[in-house]
Amino acid sequence: MNSLEMEGLKLELTEKSSKVILMWKGKSRHMNPAMILDPYFSEILDILANKEFTMDFSQLVTMNSSTVPPILSFIKELEEKRINTEIKYDSSLGWQSASFIPISTITRDYKYVKVLPI
């Protein structure tokens, strides 16, 4: 599985035994990121069976509102497939808190997906 780059955004995927980490870096400003992210997320789902997964947004500089729907869809799929997932964000960055507190509210009753400030 490869990392992904698009218009200033880099998603770095690393896999170590039973742990997979997807690190978000840079700026997500694509006008239709779902066109690129949805197929990429589908590929990631294929390798996550019986593994722990972390999506780390702490190094993301900015994210436009168009990026949120594909992330939410992916989170829902992770929960449905029972993939133990941690979503981490930098709570010292106001825009990240503003984006991820609502996501943590949406996922509060999820059993497999947890949103964690760092």
PLM regions and their residue ranges:
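STAS-like cytosolic regulatory interaction modules
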Residues: M1-V61, S73-I118
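Short conserved active-site loop signatures built around small residues
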Residues: N64
